[in-house]
């Protein structure tokens, strides 16, 4: 599937790479299963870069619209689960 990750032009290269890493963890959860700790670690880093709820909703909404994968539901399941692997 071809699509672009949502970006903010104010991010540094490192921040952009870390945001993409979070979205890739979400993809992995849907496609093969993601390691719960890695997913939550990527989400925590994402929240350091995108602390506001409004921007988070905007970026995650754009990602879900293009990919059909829900970052919100993925993180929610990871938080509520005690399984080592998260599969959506």
From Swiss-Prot:
Question: What HAMAP family does the entry give?
Answer: UPF0223 (MF_01041)
Give the UniProt family note. Belongs to the UPF0223 family.
Name listed for the protein in its UniProt record = UPF0223 protein YktA
Q: Where is the signal peptide?
A: none
What SUPFAM superfamilies does the annotation carry? BH2638-like
What is any Pfam family matched here? UPF0223
The cross-references to InterPro entries, in alphabetical order and at most eight, read:
BH2638-like_sf, UPF0223
